[in-house]
């Protein structure tokens, strides 16, 4: 996973002023400039207009299941679907804020608030960026309890916790029979009683397991947990986040499974092998510098499989020193036998990935409709590069056509490339159209000209253009077309709903001597300052790639005014019919509200991070955009039916549940902003419900 710095400076007037070093006289003349910008944006909206679909209504048969949201993605299969239908297309316009809860988290130190709450018995459970765990009454938002693990802040480069895992011991009301599990940013796995928030004393030592064991010597902040464990049976499977683009000697990316009752290690697996590791002897460590699993995993209890979206082999942007064994499983989905940790099957979405197109999305498990009218147990994997792969989750075989196509070659000296890459041609892609000089965009004719000149200077040959000293335009950037927000599936209407974004990056390779002189260092206390300084000077993030001949800078491809060099829309929301495998509608997602000059809110579609939630009521809920709204769309037509203002950026996945006490349906989302997106930071969890008379 990459943390892009300064991506969204483009809509901030003060930053534009600072970048251009405008004098007072020039600044007073900016209404003329912004008038030209506004005119250009209005013209650009011709490319971003949306007409709702006229698709026929989808007929729902049978009664709704009991609405539950007990996992990060609603179900263990990550479909982010609620069978609740009290809130529907006819009344969603009557949604209002039911309650707002503040965690009192220090927004200055929080990286991003991404924790989608889970619901158990009418109570909500979530973690703050610094791993403080909260239990709230779902009807009132009042706090039941708080557990603060007091993470070691000196060990944390940034704070993120995407959510909690839940395990219930059948037919038991004992202490910790209902328990929550969380990995922390200082490498611990903690088990809590869901009723009281107290540590489960039977788990590990004082309710926690030390995840740093077996990792060897790890630099501070280079290894931690950002996503919830995957629980299957009586084991919890835990991945890890590893700092990107640092060196060829990063911590192990080992995936480990622990007994949910005792905390005992059940098995450990990494990408160098097909079978789980034998138990380590005292003083031994897992192999370093292996691909990790930083995203959310999915499980199939019936098949006994856990599905891992894998990351890259460090460093992400240079792979010339990787071994064949290291390259076998990265940027893939790997199915492991939950009982043993052995590989059942794998499917690779990018061969020898040097673009940071790792698999960050949670695999979505569905019953996929086949051409003969039957269904197959399937796995849907959205990817950063924009393709979506549909696989038989029993075997890993594609259920829609995948072909290998030639891709650009001629990398830097010492690198090598796969001659082909897999393309999912049997399902709609969310990869951007190829860039060209004529497609360069600007808020004025001047920055459009600058973008055209810059485009001609750089190397760009479409998707999979390799890194270069000339400077490579990578589109989509490693921010992704689709990142960890993944997709939602309405199983009754057989619709896939997905939000995507577009941001090309300019990445420039430098020699070892040059990158050292520019100040690139391993991430740590000094490195954080160096990255910030580099971004402020327009270099973007500086990555050292130690152990290789090179270093690299990575920056969003923006004009001198800070606007994107490519034409809008810059963010989309799309529905795909799984039966016909066609897009039934696609629309711009988000506006420039709060970021454009003169208070203008252009519906250009904007950059977004987060996921969607779909309901039986025919609605798709999504936030994620830079304009700080939660929106509701008609899942069948794409029409926007409602929007609710959030107190901060909603860069997270929403969820919905029905209270067992009052019968009211709620839609809930964290609103804490995202440092890298420049959205308003905060500490809120906001719940919406229908107005009452």
Language model features by range: what are they?
Residues 21-49, 487:
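Internal/C-terminal transmembrane anchor helices
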Residues 69-73, 110-130, 157-188, 221-247, ...:
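Repeat-blade elements of multi-bladed beta-propeller folds
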């Amino acid at each position: 996973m990459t943390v892009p710095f300064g991506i969204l400076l483009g809509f901030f007037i003060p930053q534009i002023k600072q970048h251009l070093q405008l004098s007072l006289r020039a600044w007073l003349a900016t209404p003329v400039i912004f008038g030209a910008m506004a005119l250009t944006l209005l013209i650009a909206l011709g490319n971003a207009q949306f007409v709702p679909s006229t698709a026929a209504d989808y007929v729902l048969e049978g009664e709704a299941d009991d609405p539950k949201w007990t996992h990060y993605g609603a179900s263990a299969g990550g479909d982010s679907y609620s069978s609740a239908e009290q809130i529907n297309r006819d009344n969603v316009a009557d949604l209002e804020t039911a309650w707002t809860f503040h965690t009192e988290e220090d927004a200055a130190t929080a990286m991003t608030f991404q924790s989608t709450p889970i619901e158990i018995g009418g109570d909500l459970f979530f973690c703050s960026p610094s791993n403080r765990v909260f239990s709230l009454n779902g009807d009132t938002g009042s706090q039941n309890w708080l557990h603060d693990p007091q993470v070691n802040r000196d060990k944390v480069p940034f704070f993120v916790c995407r959510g909690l895992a839940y395990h219930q011991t059948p037919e038991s009301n004992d202490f910790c029979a209902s328990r929550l599990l969380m990995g922390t940013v200082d490498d611990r796995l903690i088990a809590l009683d869901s009723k009281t928030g107290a540590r489960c004393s039977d788990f590990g030592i004082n309710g926690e397991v030390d995840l740093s064991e077996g990792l060897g010597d790890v630099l501070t902040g280079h290894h931690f947990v950002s996503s919830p464990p995957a629980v299957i049976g009586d084991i919890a499977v835990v991945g890890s986040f590893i700092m990107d683009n640092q060196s060829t000697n990063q911590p192990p990316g080992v995936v480990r499974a622990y007994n949910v009752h005792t905390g005992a290690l059940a098995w450990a697996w990494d990408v160098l092998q097909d079978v789980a590791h034998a138990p380590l002897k005292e003083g031994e460590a897992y192999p370093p510098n292996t691909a990790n699993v930083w995203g959310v995993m999915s499980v199939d209890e019936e098949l006994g499989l856990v599905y891992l979206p894998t990351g890259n082999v460090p460093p992400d942007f240079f792979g010339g020193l990787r071994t064949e064994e290291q390259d076998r499983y990265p940027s893939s989905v790997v199915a492991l036998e939950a009982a043993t940790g052995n590989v059942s099957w794998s499917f690779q979405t990018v061969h020898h990935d040097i673009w940071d197109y790792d698999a960050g999305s949670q695999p979505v498990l569905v019953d996929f409709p086949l051409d003969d009218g039957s269904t197959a147990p399937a796995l849907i994997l959205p990817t950063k590069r924009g393709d979506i792969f549909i696989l038989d989750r029993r075997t890993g075989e594609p259920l829609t056509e995948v072909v290998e196509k030639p891709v650009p070659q001629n990398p830097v000296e010492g690198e090598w490339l796969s001659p082909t890459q897999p393309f999912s041609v049997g399902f709609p892609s969310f990869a951007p159209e190829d860039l060209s000089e004529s497609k360069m965009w600007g808020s004025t004719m001047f920055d459009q000209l600058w973008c055209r000149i810059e485009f001609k200077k750089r190397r760009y040959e479409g998707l999979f253009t390799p890194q270069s000293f000339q400077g490579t335009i990578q589109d989509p950037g490693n921010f992704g077309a689709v990142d960890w927000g993944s997709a939602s599936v309405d199983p009754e209407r057989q619709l896939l709903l997905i939000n995507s974004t577009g941001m090309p990056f300019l990445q420039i390779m430098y020699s070892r001597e040059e990158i050292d002189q520019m100040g690139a260092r391993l991430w740590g206390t000094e490195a954080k300052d160096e990255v910030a300084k580099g971004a402020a000077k327009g270099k973007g993030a500086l990555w050292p790639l130690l152990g290789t001949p090179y270093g690299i800078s990575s920056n969003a491809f923006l004009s001198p005014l800070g606007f994107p060099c490519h034409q809008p829309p810059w963010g989309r929301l799309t529905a795909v019919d799984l039966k016909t495998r066609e897009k039934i509608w696609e629309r711009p997602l988000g506006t420039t509200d709060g970021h454009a000059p003169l208070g203008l809110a252009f519906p250009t579609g904007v950059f977004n991070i987060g996921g969607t939630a779909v309901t039986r009521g025919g609605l798709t809920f999504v936030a994620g955009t830079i304009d700080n709204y939660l929106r509701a769309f008609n899942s069948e037509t794409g029409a926007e039916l409602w929007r609710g203002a959030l107190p901060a950026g909603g860069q997270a996945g929403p969820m919905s549940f029905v209270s067992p006490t009052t019968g009211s349906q709620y839609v809930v989302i964290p609103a804490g902003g995202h440092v890298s997106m420049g959205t308003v930071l905060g500490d809120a969890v906001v719940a919406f419900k229908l107005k009452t008379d």
